């Protein structure tokens, strides 16, 4: 049997801060476990790609994490990833049908915008939630 959906859906996130330690760099994203629950819920691993290619690789392990102060707000760890800077964008791949359907307003975080790209047409399916819509 095959998949009806396949590898679809990408969560775009911005690097808001990089916290350096001896062997690791914690890449803090603006996306969090409430946006993509699969890694926190059952250890799913999603491919992460930089949106702009620079070529220079980091010598440290990058730990991709969200801004929520929870030990499970972690996406993945990657060695030899391209060097990143604050305000860079990354793509978390293959979030598919479970990305938005498992998302929540945990920690009063609004759900992300949903955009459909069909060929050269780009359409907003659902606008980003506003804080007043949550409360």
Whereabouts are the PLM-identified features?
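Charged (often Lys/Glu-rich) extended helix/loop segments that serve as interaction or gating elements
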Residues: 1-135
């Amino acid at each position: 049997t095959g998949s009806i959906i396949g590898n679809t859906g990408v969560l775009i996130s911005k690097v808001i801060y990089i916290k350096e330690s001896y062997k690791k760099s914690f890449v803090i994203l603006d996306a969090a476990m409430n946006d993509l629950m699969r890694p926190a819920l059952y250890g799913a691993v999603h491919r992460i790609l930089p949106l702009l290619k620079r070529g220079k690789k980091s010598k440290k392990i990058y730990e991709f994490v969200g801004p929520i102060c929870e030990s499970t707000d972690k996406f993945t760890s990657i060695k030899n990833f391209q060097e990143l800077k604050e305000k860079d964008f990354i793509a978390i791949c293959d979030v598919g049908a479970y990305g938005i359907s498992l998302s929540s307003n945990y920690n009063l975080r609004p759900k992300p915008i949903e955009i459909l790209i069909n060929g050269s047409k780009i359409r907003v399916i659902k606008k980003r939630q506003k804080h007043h819509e949550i409360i």
